[in-house]
From Swiss-Prot:
The lineage of its organism: Archaea, Methanobacteriati, Methanobacteriota, Thermococci, Thermococcales. This is MEMO1 family protein TK1477. Belongs to the MEMO1 family. HAMAP family: MEMO1. Pfam families: Memo. InterPro entries: MEMO1_fam (IPR002737). Disulfide bonds: none annotated. It comes from the Archaea.
Length: 291
């Protein structure tokens, strides 16, 4: 089963400019490490011109800590297609950088252990939130001279129960199979503006990014404390428009089970820094969890 790119040429370049862009993002990349302390990371999934640098901070940290055997990538289902909790079946994903294999053995085991996940490719066909993560992984795997696999999982339902089920299923499946895994939670934070139906406050252009950051940091503080329930409580209280809390919650649950004891915010920004528009502003964060 082959999954072809759906957003190459829109969210990220479809030609040689992609490599040039990744080289700029990773211009400060160090040597690949072998500590393997990182259990999971959070990375945004907007167009690379807006959030690519922030996402690169997550992958830089993982590379310098040591690449895993498999990345389990969780992203929100924006299209509404397919199974509510969809693990991509065995197969291959293609991007402008080439092919990357789905870890079919791990995908099947996660779906078997989980009480809610199905093997389903339809949910992934047009979804961008996972696709935009893949070129970062391919680029760094090439740098390291390693073959790295992925397990893409889309979430159409996002709550504490989903996070608990999936986080535990990923941990138990990887332990059962002896797989070295890093979980990636693909999410953007606040989506501010009439286009998103979310204008919880008004502010001058020079104040708006700071106000958005304040609201996002109420959630980020909970994430850094490994507090899944508190994160969802903050989201509900603010009616916050973070799009991938289920994946973040899953990453936290998995990380706790995998022995993580600390989390670090590596980078935060908003789309305003590029667009200079206050009509639609989105927050982006890079976070890693470590043993």
């Amino acid at each position: 089963m082959v999954r072809y790119p759906a957003v190459a040429g829109s969210f990220y370049p479809a030609d040689e400019e992609l490599v040039l862009m990744l080289e700029r993002f990773f211009s400060d990349l160090g040597e690949e490490g072998n500590d393997r302390r990182i259990t999971a990371g959070v990375a945004p999934h907007a167009g690379y011109i807006f959030s690519g640098y922030t996402a690169s901070r997550t992958y830089k940290a993982i590379f310098e800590d040591g690449l895993p055997e498999t990345f389990v990538i969780l992203g929100p289902n924006h299209t509404g297609l397919g199974s509510p909790i969809a693990v991509h079946p065995p197969g291959t994903w293609i991007t402008p950088l080439g092919e990357i294999e789905v870890d079919g053995e791990l995908a099947r085991e996660i779906a078997k252990i989980s009480g809610i996940a199905d093997l389903d490719d339809l949910a992934h066909k047009y979804e961008h939130s996972i696709e935009v993560q893949v070129p970062f992984i391919q680029y760094l795997a090439e740098k390291a001279g390693k073959e790295v696999k992925i397990v893409p999982i889309t979430l159409g339902i996002q709550d504490e129960d989903v996070a608990e089920d999936l986080g535990r299923a990923i941990f138990e499946a990887s332990r059962e199979l002896g797989k070295d895994v890093v979980v990636i939670a693909s999410t953007d934070f606040m989506h501010y503006g009439q286009i998103y139906g979310y204008v919880p406050f008004r502010a001058r252009a020079d104040e708006l990014p700071h106000r958005i950051k304040e609201w996002d940091f109420r959630i980020i503080r909970r994430i850094l404390d490994f507090d899944v329930r508190g994160m969802f409580e903050e989201i509900r209280e603010m009616n916050h428009t973070m799009c991938g809390p289920g994946g973040v919650g899953t990453a936290i649950v998995y990380s706790r089970l995998a022995g993580a004891v600390e989390a670090e915010l590596l980078h935060y920004t908003t789309s305003f820094e590029v667009s200079r528009s206050t009509e639609a502003v989105v927050g982006y964060a890079s976070i890693v969890f470590r043993r």
